[in-house]
Amino acid sequence: MADKEKDAVIVDETEHVDVDSKESKKEKKTKQQQKIEFLEAEVKELNDKYLRTLAEAENFKKRIQAEKIMDRKYAASSFATELLVPYEQFSKIVDFPSDNELLNNFLIGFKMIRDQFKSVLENEGVVEIKALGEVFDAKVHHAIEKESNKDKPNGTVLEVLQNGYLFKDRILRPAMVKINEWSEDNGEDK
């Protein structure tokens, strides 16, 4: 009988081991499944970060390319600004009235040179801002003086004190102007 008892104990132990091993296999599978799910989530997150970084790099390249284009487009703006001073001085000289016929003959030639100079500036994108008689626009005009004139609409540019210029679509220098500011209430300057 002792052998039968030993066999019964061994059978009980193996059944107990089988039950434990089944439970541990389930736990292992559950842990492995959790680990797989965790790794899949991590891969998804890393892939998302990668795609975002890739998109940021693409946007950065596009922004740098756009800046290069803008830099090339406006590269001559400082040069054009410096040319405006001698151009305007030259224009004032040739527009100066004279009674001397010999001097007027020279001035005709100089006016032709000035017109060529102006044409070159315009071909490169430098354009004079129209101001005289226009409605005051703070974007392109700078009011230096104001005057009361009942015959002109309020806010009209009465006189250009210094010409303003655009380079392509940027302001090189605003036009310095005298504007009309008149109040109908009291007939005086505002």
Curated annotation (Swiss-Prot):
> Could you tell me which Gene3D superfamilies the record lists for this protein?
3.90.20.20, Head domain of nucleotide exchange factor GrpE
Which residue ranges are recorded for the region named Disordered?
Answer: 1-31
Any one GO MF annotation of this record: unfolded protein binding
- Keywords annotated in UniProt: Chaperone, Cytoplasm, Stress response
- Please give the coiled-coil regions recorded for this protein: none
Q: Which InterPro entries match?
A: GrpE, GrpE_coiled_coil, GrpE_head
What are the annotated GO cellular component locations? cytoplasm
List localization entries: Cytoplasm
> Any one Gene Ontology biological process term?
protein folding
Give the Basic and acidic residues compositional bias ranges: 1-26
One Pfam assignment = GrpE
The record, for NCBIfam families, names:
PRK14140.1 (NF010738)
Q: Which family does it belong to?
A: Belongs to the GrpE family.
Q: How does it assemble?
A: Homodimer.
Q: Which PANTHER family match?
A: GRPE PROTEIN (PTHR21237), GRPE PROTEIN HOMOLOG, MITOCHONDRIAL (PTHR21237:SF23)
What does this protein's UniProt record list under function? Participates actively in the response to hyperosmotic and heat shock by preventing the aggregation of stress-denatured proteins, in association with DnaK and GrpE. It is the nucleotide exchange factor for DnaK and may function as a thermosensor. Unfolded proteins bind initially to DnaJ; upon interaction with the DnaJ-bound protein, DnaK hydrolyzes its bound ATP, resulting in the formation of a stable complex. GrpE releases ADP from DnaK; ATP binding to DnaK triggers the release of the substrate protein, thus completing the reaction cycle.
Provide the protein name: Protein GrpE
